[in-house]
Design a protein with these regions (language model features):
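Short basic helix-loop element that most often maps to the first helix and adjoining turn
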Residues: 3-22
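Recognition helix of helix-turn-helix/homeodomain-like DNA-binding domains
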Residues: 25-38
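Short C-terminal boundary/hinge segments that cap the last helix of small helical domains
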Residues: 19, 53-64
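Hydrophobic micro-packing sites on short alpha-helices
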Residues: 44-49, 59-60
């Protein structure tokens, strides 16, 4: 589950629908990414990061 992405989205006061519209994907895609059911392309990751004001490491790096 991508809690980091969800928290960053909530910190920007964006709904899944709003974020999806800004980056040009469906709300379902955002939901699947946040739930860990979809691995986005690097391009999509970069677009999400731009909108949320985060780096790829901030949102998608997993500490093991």
């Amino acid at each position: 589950m991508n809690e980091k992405m969800k928290q960053a989205r909530l910190d920007k006061n964006l709904s899944q629908t709003e974020l999806a519209k800004i980056i040009g994907v469906s709300r379902q895609t955002i939901n699947m990414i946040e739930n860990g059911d979809y691995n986005p392309t690097i391009g999509l990751c970069r677009n999400i990061c731009k909108v949320l004001g985060c780096t790829l490491n901030d949102l998608f790096w997993e500490d093991k």
